């Protein structure tokens, strides 16, 4: 019984030590619980931030979608306005009709038809010139020569008529001389030869000429030069006027607005009207060429007229030959 007491003491001491350690355990538990709550709180904050970011991203996405839809709507309205303006312009005769593609096709066919007709004309012209050359070399009489000369002059009238018809389909094709060889185009003036230059060439090739003939050719050359200058000045004025019309509203802001569309259509209508005078310029130039040939025939004798036609033909033939030689030259 005496030995039992120390064990009891020891047991009591252990109990006391355990009791003394219990506050520490409680503190550790408190710290652990606080840490858990802090982690939960931080996790909640991160979640809230992510939710806020998602809401902001969704809001911006909705705004972008709304702006895109509005842009599409504005574009649709602007397109509708343009279509209405174009429709009104067509009804008023300001704009080219909806058959523009068909007109372009007809224009292209007209140019092609003229090129074909010109090739046939040139073939027949060369045949007639060879006939005239043979008659001159054979010292044929004036009656025979006059018959061939008149035939060639009538043949020239035919090409002038064909050019006039072709110009109605495509005046640019005829005016630019696309139906000629490159070398011929270099010397082209308003879709053909320059009458004053032709007379200058003939005056040196038809000697001897009487004083009356020289005076007649000189006067014809001066009048032709004056007419050429007037037509050239008219073409320059037309080009300047066209440039001013087309450049009228370039660079203006809000090009899609209704007012600017109407202004654009009006300017195109003015430009189209001015381009319509090109056919008139070409017609006047061809009339001058035709009259020059006729006046030349009146001034010269039949034999001189025959020689003049041969000179004109030989000069044109040499230009065509020059084009062929140039195109066939060795390329380095």
UniProtKB/Swiss-Prot annotation:
Query: Which residues does the annotated region (Disordered) include?
Result: 1-48
User: Where in or outside the cell?
Assistant: Nucleus
Quaternary structure and interacting proteins, as annotated: Binds DNA as a dimer.
Residue stretches making up the bZIP domain = 44-107
* Family to which the UniProt record says this protein belongs: Belongs to the bZIP family.
Q: Which UniProt keywords apply?
A: Activator, Coiled coil, DNA-binding, Nucleus, Transcription, Transcription regulation
Any one Gene Ontology molecular-function term assigned to this protein's record: sequence-specific DNA binding
Keyword Transcription regulation present in the record's keywords: the answer is yes
DOG1 domain location is: 111-329
Please name the SUPFAM superfamilies in this protein's record: Leucine zipper domain (SSF57959)
Task: Kindly give the InterPro entries that the UniProt entry links to this protein.
Answer: bZIP, bZIP_sf, TGA_domain
Any matching Pfam family:
bZIP_1
Q: What does this protein do?
A: Transcriptional activator that binds specifically to the DNA sequence 5'-TGACG-3'. Recognizes ocs elements like the as-1 motif of the cauliflower mosaic virus 35S promoter. Binding to the as-1-like cis elements mediate auxin- and salicylic acid-inducible transcription. Binds to the hexamer motif 5'-ACGTCA-3' of histone gene promoters.
This chain belongs to the protein called: Transcription factor HBP-1b(c38)
Organism taxonomic ancestry: Eukaryota, Viridiplantae, Streptophyta, Embryophyta, Tracheophyta
Which SMART domains does this one have? Answer: BRLZ
**According to the UniProt record, where is the region Leucine-zipper?**
72-86
Region feature (Basic motif):
46-66
